[in-house]
Amino acid sequence: MELSDYFRILRTRGWIIVVVAVVAAVSAFGASRAQRPIYKSSMQVTVLPARNDMGLAQTTKQLLRAYVTIMDTKNWAQQVLDRLAQDGHPQDMTPEQLKNNVIIASYEDKNVIQIDAKDGAGEQANRIAWLWAQEFETWRNLENGKVRKEDQVDVKLGDYPTYAKFRPQTTINTAAGGIFGALLGALIVAALEWIESGLVRTPADVERNLGLAVLGVIPTSER
């Protein structure tokens, strides 16, 4: 196809691409606005050995994974639910449901454990992440009381968390819908052009398809 053919297609069928893209973008925007917003709050906890000893520091790094396993349990979630109820913020969910809304990960190079809590209310997500970390601090202090001071592992809580919207990402979804719609519209246009590629409408079509020069054209009859 020549460049002029592409311009002809855009001129005659470009509206299809635009319409499909707009419809897809509007649909994605509407679907995003209809979703219940979910907020995420992240809390960081730093785990520090009591003495600057290479052996204890290495052990602490290994313990980080164990701490994550201990915190990522239904029993731990129940403790957080109890704390929420005591603070006047009871949750209508089971420990399993709360546990599924919390992701705990360790970063051994920084001696940090990160707690990500998701909830339909931003402030509640903050409280869950904060209390989850506080429970860990309390448990770690109790464990420290069982060992010598030089063998203790201290816990330092980060700043009180601040929530952010986790989903829906309305802007991203709308843009993705528009791009998908434009691609779909382009496929529709390509299909229409392929279907009609065998039709001959003008002398130029004859020359392009058959490679023959048109010597004359039979005029249409008028009645």
What annotation goes with each model-predicted range?
Residues 1-223:
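Hydrophobic and amphipathic membrane-targeting/association helices
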